[in-house]
């Protein structure tokens, strides 16, 4: 069984500008440099105004994770996330994310939407987290989900700041 977590942000910029920044290779590299942890990397990247596909690697320290999760983590703990986005009409983008956590009984996936809203835009992400550990899986899913929501907020803030510095 998995648990769902919802994230929502309302950037002041239109969806096309937010999309362009979110999938920009320079922005992704800068974001990973600041937020990605040890051995963070942009592993694959292709993007244009209609479509984007990229794979990123985050390196995380087990001691930075909740205690309920630590015993299940390898010492070289990393997360590999593949995102694909496509333009879905004027001012609308739809995306999917698949998250691989090698060496753990956990995985995650997500559906993403970005659309124009008023003078800005709205970003919505629904993440499904599954941890296959008897009796503790639900508690670990809650911990991992909370960490994902924090990371999404930090990534959004970084991207919006990057946009303002690179306008």
Language-model features, listed with the residues they occupy:
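Hydrophobic ligand-binding cavity/cleft-lining segments
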Residues: 1-62, 68
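Hydrophobic pocket/interface hotspot
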Residues: 18-22, 125, 159
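Short secondary-structure junctions
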Residues: 30-37, 89-92, 104-105
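Amphipathic hydrophobic-ligand
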Residues: 36, 71-80, 104-110
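Short, ordered beta-strand-loop transition motifs
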Residues: 43-53, 87-90, 115-118
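Beta-strand/loop substructures that line and gate deep hydrophobic ligand-binding cavities in soluble
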Residues: 55, 84, 93-145
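Helix-adjacent hinge/juxtasegments
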Residues: 61-88
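A conserved amphipathic terminal alpha-helix motif
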Residues: 86-87, 137-167
């Amino acid at each position: 069984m998995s648990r769902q977590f919802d994230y929502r942000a309302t950037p002041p910029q239109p969806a096309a500008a937010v999309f362009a920044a979110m999938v920009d290779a320079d922005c992704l590299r800068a974001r990973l440099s600041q937020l990605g942890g040890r051995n963070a990397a942009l592993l694959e990247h292709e993007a244009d105004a209609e479509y984007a596909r990229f794979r990123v690697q985050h390196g995380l320290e087990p001691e930075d994770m909740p205690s309920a999760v630590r015993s299940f983590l390898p010492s070289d703990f990393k997360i590999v996330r593949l995102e694909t986005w496509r333009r879905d009409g004027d001012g609308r983008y739809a995306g999917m994310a698949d998250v691989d956590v090698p060496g753990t009984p956990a995985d995650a996936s997500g559906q993403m939407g970005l659309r124009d809203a008023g003078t800005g835009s709205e970003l919505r992400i629904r993440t499904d987290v599954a941890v296959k550990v008897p009796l503790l899986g639900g508690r670990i899913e809650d911990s991992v989900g909370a960490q994902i929501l924090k990371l999404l907020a930090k990534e959004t803030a970084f991207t919006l700041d990057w946009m303002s510095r690179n306008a």
